[in-house]
Amino acid sequence: MPTAKQLADIGYKTFSTSMMLLTVYGGYLCSVRAYHYFQRRSSRRQAAEEQKTSGAL
């Protein structure tokens, strides 16, 4: 039977690990959003440039 200190240590390590994984996952989600944002921005810019050049003809 684990002592109270051992249970507290296990709980702390479990909590710390879950917080670390949530932080890593949050960073991943944030970077994916930023990547898609910049992809859409560049494709919109390209479409605007194409529209300008086709409108000038």
Swiss-Prot record:
Disulfide bonds: none annotated. Pfam families: COX14. Keywords: Membrane, Mitochondrion, Mitochondrion outer membrane, Transmembrane, Transmembrane helix. It comes from the Eukaryota. Residues 38-57 are cytoplasmic. One of its GO terms (cellular component) is mitochondrion. The keyword Ribonucleoprotein does not apply. The chain crosses the membrane at residues 15-37. One of its GO terms (biological process) is mitochondrial cytochrome c oxidase assembly. Its main location: mitochondrion. Residues 1-14 are mitochondrial intermembrane. It is a single-pass membrane protein. The keyword DNA-binding does not apply. It is found in: Mitochondrion outer membrane. Core component of the MITRAC (mitochondrial translation regulation assembly intermediate of cytochrome c oxidase complex) complex, that regulates cytochrome c oxidase assembly. Requires for coordination of the early steps of cytochrome c oxidase assembly with the synthesis of MT-CO1. Along with COA3, core component of the MITRAC (mitochondrial translation regulation assembly intermediate of cytochrome c oxidase complex) complex. This is Cytochrome c oxidase assembly protein COX14. The gene is COX14.
